[in-house]
Amino acid sequence: MIEVVAGIDAGGTKLAVRVETLDGTRLCDKEFPAEDWSASPVDTAATWLRERLDRAVPAGYRMLAAGIGAQGCDTQKHCAELETALAEQGLRAVVVNDAALLVPAAGLTEGIGVISGTGAIGVGANADGDPLFAGGWGWVIGDEAGSAGIVRLATVAALTAHDEGNPDDGLLSSLLRAFDVDGPEALARKVNDEATAENWGPHAPAVFTAVEDGSALAGEVVGAAADHLAALVRRLVTRGAVGKDVVAAGSVITGQPRFEAAFRARIGTAFPHLTVTLLEDLPVAGGVALARRHTGNA
């Protein structure tokens, strides 16, 4: 049987699987729904991953190793436990946090990866190779550079301005249209009654639309989100993260040029030695790279 390696990107909404032969021939890129993905308990997570990987690998090929980026694996211990659980199911794997796929996906061996998508997290490594994490707390208490966190910040800003008697500068009305409600009180209920990323995140474009339409308040929200993402990089650098590159991915930073520019400006000012790069390939490419390194076929 022909040996292959795989990359897996297990995020909050979808699972991406890429399978390649050892000579680099790509056999498939597949996606599966991942709303029910959880990194804990590890035995259940391993079964969940193995079942979907088996469905992705074409018949007649043998899986040599997989590189897995798993949302929710936020410590080295957790990653190691999931690796062990996968090994017990016959899968040789290296497991990292999903944000840690970005640097290898960009063809680099060191650097800082930041995700600004549904949530927001930064991942790096120190000179000894130990992983470092910043952010990724979730949209209820953090992740202000993610789509759900941006909507939370914007809603608070718009409702606060309304309570203070300030006229709507466009942010409140943009949110009302996005959530299809007729007033501030209804907006508060709509946001609170379903405090999920699925309810909040898709409305982030309304904040950026308000910025384009001239809302200063929306501009402040976007600036605060860029500050948050830059702060994740600062925390990692302060703790010894190595590398000269910051690799960014996620729907917000890749889909909103104004936000990308704000983030670049902040990194350029605070860390002129760092270069910000938007990931051009899918993050799952980093899983393939990790699998190749794991087997000595890099």
What are these model-derived regions, one by one?
Residues 74-76, 101-103, 121-122, 253-255:
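Short, active-site-adjacent cap segments at secondary-structure transitions
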Residues 64, 86-93, 129-138, 266-275:
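Glycine/charged-rich beta-loop-alpha catalytic/anionic-binding loops adjacent to active sites
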Residues 1, 91-114, 130:
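Conserved phosphate-binding catalytic cores of ATP/NTP-utilizing and phosphoryl-transfer enzymes
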Residues 111-160:
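Hydrophobic alpha-helical segments and helix pairs
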Residues 31-37, 99-100, 118-120, 137-140:
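Short, acidic/turn-prone active-site loops that include or flank metal/cofactor-
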Residues 1-62, 106-112, 155-298:
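ATP-binding/phosphotransfer module of carbohydrate and carboxylate kinases, centering on a glycine-rich
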Residues 31-38, 54-94, 106-107:
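Short beta-strand-loop/turn "lid" adjacent to the catalytic site in phosphate-handling enzymes
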Residues 13, 71-73, 118-121:
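Short glycine-rich anion-binding loops that position phosphate/pyrophosphate groups of nucleotides
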